[in-house]
């Protein structure tokens, strides 16, 4: 049976790849998992779907996670990987879910400081935009996946020696000017929803081309689940990338 992915080594970091490197689109997919959990079957299936349906070469790095590592080490490794993708001269997309979504939003701010080009598109599913969880109280009674207390402690570990409101870990507090066109999904029953809304408002205030899609009555990272609403979300992803 032919595998749906390959595993490569990039400067000591394992990277799963899907599709053909000569594809029209290149997607750097940062997986979620609260910065402590590894890539899972949902991510593998979604990356495979992206590669098959969108003429895309998809890379999903196994980046260093808390508590043994923090954001600084991951940013260094992902920066080198990103530089190699710029050289492919394809339609370049940063994509991620949950913590991975928060990472790429912070990363898009970071690369401006080192004069790297922005991607062509940014797409996130339920991004964690404020690891300080400063907009408390959060209503986590309706969220079947996430809880405030645990996330707050994980955020401190991921930040390492940084303040939890540093833009490298909490993109809500960073400079979003000149950010690439951005598509964001969130369910209105997840605890990240109100922080994501604040982030979207900040993008709009800075004239960033942003589209925010709310899943009514839905939950965290709903576009990655096998539900009808996820099919609609995928059509929006395809539209963002292909048009």
Where are these regions (language model features)?
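Alpha/beta-hydrolase superfamily serine-hydrolase fold, recognizing
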Residues: 5, 10-18, 22-243
């Amino acid at each position: 049976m032919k595998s749906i992915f390959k595993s490569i080594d990039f400067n000591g970091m394992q990277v799963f790849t899907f599709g053909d490197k000569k594809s029209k689109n290149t997607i750097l997919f940062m997986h979620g998992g609260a910065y402590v959990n590894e890539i899972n079957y949902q991510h593998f299936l979604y990356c495979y779907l992206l590669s098959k349906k969108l003429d895309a070469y998809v890379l999903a790095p196994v980046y260093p996670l808390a508590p043994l590592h923090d954001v600084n080490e991951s940013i260094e490794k992902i920066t080198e990987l990103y530089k190699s993708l710029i050289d492919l001269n394809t339609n370049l997309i940063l994509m991620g879910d949950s913590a991975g979504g928060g990472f790429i939003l912070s990363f898009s701010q970071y690369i401006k400081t080192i004069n790297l080009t922005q991607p062509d598109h940014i797409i996130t599913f339920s991004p964690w935009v404020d690891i300080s969880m400063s907009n408390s109280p959060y209503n986590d009674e309706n969220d079947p996946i996430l809880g405030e207390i645990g996330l707050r402690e994980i955020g401190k570990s991921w930040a390492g020696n940084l303040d939890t409101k540093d833009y490298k870990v909490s993109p809500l507090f960073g400079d979003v000017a000149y950010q690439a066109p951005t598509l964001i999904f969130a369910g209105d029953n997840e605890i990240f929803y109100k922080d994501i809304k604040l982030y979207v408002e900040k993008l709009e205030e800075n004239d960033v081309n942003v589209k925010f899609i709310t899943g009514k009555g839905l939950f965290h990272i709903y576009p990655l689940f096998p539900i009808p609403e996820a099919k609609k979300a995928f059509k929006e992803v395809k539209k963002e990338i292909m048009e």
